[in-house]
Amino acid sequence: MIDTQNTFENQILEGIPASLPTKKGYDEHVNHAPKRKDILTAEEKKLALKNALRYFDKSFHAELIEEFKEELDLYGRIYMYRFRPDYEMYARPINQYPAKSKHAAAIMLMIMNNLDPKVAQHPHELITYGGNGAVFQNWAQYRLTMKYLAEMNDEQTLVMYSGHPMGLFPSNRNAPRVVVTNGMMIPNYSSQDDWEKFNALGVTQYGQMTAGSYMYIGPQGIVHGTTITVLNGFRKIKKSPEGGVFVTSGLGGMSGAQPKAGNIAGCITVCAEVNPKAIATRHSQGWVDEVVSDLGELTARVKKAQAAKETVSIAYEGNVVEVWEKFDVENIHVDLGSDQTSLHNPWAGGYYPVGLTLEESQALMASNSDAFKEKVQESLRRHAAAVNKHTDKGTYFFDYGNAFLLEASRAGADVMASNGIDFKYPSYVQDIMGPMCFDYGFGPFRWVCASGDPEDLKKTDAIACQVLEEIKETAPEEIQKQLEDNIQWIKSAQENKLVVGSQARILYADAEGRIKIAKAFNKAIEENKIGFVILGRDHHDVSGTDSPYRETSNIYDGSSFTADMAIHNVIGDSFRGASWVSIHNGGGVGWGEVINGGFGMVLDGSMEADKRLQSMLFWDVNNGIARRSWARNEEAVFAIKRAMQVEPDLKVTLPSFVDEDLL
């Protein structure tokens, strides 16, 4: 690996090389994506090759076609491994990027963070998290995009079609520097197999949420929300987390936050994971305390932790179904239960069935996808049956928005309520995140210190904490608990050692909090106390995502299957000052089940940045509160009325509540 600043700049500016780089081998030490489904016909495979070769000069086609054929045959996709860059992949300080526009340089920083091997799940396949959450489809797209970003000025906009850089178009300084779409399909063509087919053809990709939108900040990105969920789960069952047991699964890019969240909440977390590389990554990063591979040893360890009321997180190397079944036999009481396997992607490595090893599963999904699907559905039925035995004993189980209940129901598992319509278990958004956070406007605000300096992150933590404490002094009773939890979070952020990759922080905040924190950052930048700051959020937020099985699962007026909110949100962000915007298909629950979007905004200390953040952040939160209010969510009605008092130009249509006796 060559990594001088000169090499880095030259390869960025070069884009797709004028001469072919040396062919790169398949690195067995890296966590790779499983082989994808062989779904293309012979003619479609020719089309996939034509599509891949169009990035290169015709003189290279004869050599590359054999290589790309081999990749398509071996992996089900054409990743163009040869074109992986020779420099180290990580979020460099913003001043090291050879860019004319600081906004573009910030986006380059964020892209490289998403592909950092310490951060990304399958870095060589350009997958950040979730098994198939892609930044790009291939390395040619990466190289071309970085070249465009280096060349562009602040009067241009880069247009990204599902990882493909369509080009730089004239715009203006107030327009976004980049507009991203991922997986935008004609509605009738959005099934799992449609993703397999059109992704293999090289014409679309699944961007998950923050993968394809360049806003991932490692597992920290979900740990605050997971901590809120675990804490409030224990509050819901009126039990202290001390000595309580939380059983779940997954140690990937998002699910890997669970053990850390359990530690912060103060409980015993048992998190099952079948992939030893994922376990090793999270253990080495300090995101899980202990690793156990024997069920008997796990049982003894949990009983000991219960007796001592320890705070500890334990990774079990194996299938979570085995854990649920063993704990039932051993009569270990589980207080909270959930699941964070990637069931948005059930047939291509998102969920590994009990009874098969990781290697056996990967071989079967490649050789006989129908048989693998049967094994997954059989496992889901067994999984749900084991969970049901625990809930009969008092376990509080919730769906973590990963399509567990959805796919279990499709498999015929016993997860339906007596009415045959609803699930017997709630989504965490229905019970916790929706009414407590989203309806009041609280969601996963985040920022990245573009200098890469940990001292800048410390300073921004202190600034954010001071702002929240000032807000809390006059805040209404309805949001005091949220502010209290968030102040405690930011105060303990440094000691919890959350950073993996870029110097970033996540903090749940409402519109008032986000705007005041951003303004305080911008002032600190103007005064040269800190470097540039990149603002953003998860798509999993108040306004960003329409998802009937997760983000909008607590919308009960029938509109949870509509996507007006997410579409309006990205359009509104685009002309209110975002540096880049994105809109995706399927984030979280899966392709065809969701429309989700996000933004990034660069703060440079200017008055212009102050105006942009005020306008855009206010809209970015209150759009969703208005929609939730119209759905008759009382917490949202309260929040939008408050917002209208603060901003006289905001006039929102409020619902009239119907007397149930009239119906």
Label the predicted regions.
Residues 313-341, 345-348:
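Active-site/ligand-binding-proximal alpha/beta "capping" segment
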Residues 276, 318-321, 340-345, 401-407, ...:
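Glycine-rich beta-alpha junction loops
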Residues 207-231, 235, 241-245, 249-309, ...:
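Catalytic or ion-translocation cores adjacent to nucleophile or general acid/base/metal-coordination motifs
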Residues 245-248, 311-316, 398:
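Short catalytic-loop micro-motif centered on adjacent basic/acidic residues
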Residues 1-200, 204-215, 368-520, 524-536, ...:
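Long, compositionally biased, glycine/small-hydrophobic-enriched stretches that function as flexible linkers
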